[in-house]
Amino acid sequence: ARKQPVYNWLLEKFPNQPDSITYYLNKSHKVKLFDYAKGSIEMNISTMDSIRYMVRFMHCAFVAMEPQTGAVKAWVGDINFDSWKYDKVKAMRQPGSTFKLFVYTEAMNQGLTPCDKRRDEYITMQVYDKKKQEVVTWTPSNANGSFSGDSMPLKSAFAKSINSVAVRLGQEMGIKRIIETAEKMGIKSPLEDAPSLALGSSDVNLLELTNAYCTIANDGMHHEPVLVTRIEDKDGKEVFLGPATSEQAVPYKTAFLVQQLLMGGMREPGGTSQSLWGYVGDYRDTDFGGKTGTSNNHSDAWFMGVSPKLVVDAWVGGEYRSIHFRTGALGQGSRTALPICGYFLQSVFRDPAFKQYHGKFGKPRDADITRDMYLCDSYYPRAKKDTTETDSTGGEGIIILDGNGNPIREISPGDLLPSEQGQEKKRSRPTEQPLNLDEL
């Protein structure tokens, strides 16, 4: 309640009278609220009750952009403008695993390929904690709380969003180099030089993240976002012309290899973007890729949908970071943000008026890009756990898809080792304390 304008007004009217402030905060009066069925509604309730009601809504922001021009084709700032004026497209939130794009892009810059391997294993390091102002031990974990111990191609690690591999790559490539690459691709927000940046610990906004992914979709060429292309006065005289400049932010070879990584999110076994096939599977004349992202405590859920001529990004989260889902069953990017992008892409690609957005990334143009750099055996674990908590599609079983998105086989919970089933049950128990809304 202390964050609301009415509290400051009451504080000025009743200085040193906390009982009076509490009385008026709990006194019923006419309040405007939001309802999904009716939109804006009026009710006679107290300010405290209105906060308890409104704060529970999950919010959404969405952007669609053309990679070749930077033209913003869709911009949705929130679920209802009358109730929430703040534009969530510009909100600063942790990008989670969507930031791994820059880690892997820099890895490709430095000569690695999607078929190079790294091991998914325990890693620990000493880092400086700014809040505690001391050196602490940081042990990043995977979303499912375990490590396979296996060596896997980078294309599999990216598709499955393996945190341990991303952190290790961050140390190998250098965080400063990753920051430089992210800035060249379109990230303008300040990024902290810390190992956790590889997992998306620094805040960014939706617009710049979408713009950066467009750089990869556009073969490494970066365009600034364009909202207005041209303005004329009443006499038809041009008074403004939108920017049409572009620059090669990352080499073509790097962009091509990262495109393969993004498509692998839908094609690799256990890829966290596989459920996008349910929305765009009918449009085989177009290449699709994606990357999910989820921040700590499921406070932010992201999905980046990528095609050669259209890039979309959705964010879902609470008004405050303390408002979030308790588990990954609903809180992951694949569960909340991916369907938003999926329905939008489906509506675009089924419309004959938008045939210009169909197309494939194409074969490599450079002779030094060989097939063995990006076409290699996928990683198949010996036994698979429920990937609901790893930004994956989840469900009763795990669907394994081939390179064209067709099911190969299904691994059911019965295929899990008994010890792993027990671990899953333990992980599924919520341990988070319930939120006290009165403290807002």
Residue ranges, per PLM feature:
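Low-complexity, Gly/Ser/Thr/Pro-rich intrinsically disordered linker/tail segments
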Residues: T370-L440
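Mid-domain, small-residue-enriched loop/turn segments at the edges of structured enzyme/sensor domains
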Residues: K132-P140, E172-N211, G220, E224-P225
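Extended, hydrophobic alpha-helical segments in both membrane/secreted and soluble proteins
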Residues: V72-K73, N80, K85, P95-M108, ...
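Active-site SXXK
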Residues: T69-G70, M92-D120, Q126, A157, ...
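Conserved catalytic neighborhood of penicillin-recognizing serine enzymes
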Residues: L112-K176, H222, K234-Q259, M263
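Hydrophobic "anchor" residues
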Residues: A71-V72, E238, P407
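A penicillin-recognizing enzyme superfamily signal
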Residues: A1-E66, W75-V76, F81-K88, F99, ...
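C-terminal substrate/ligand-recognition segments
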Residues: V55-V72, F99, T105, N109, ...
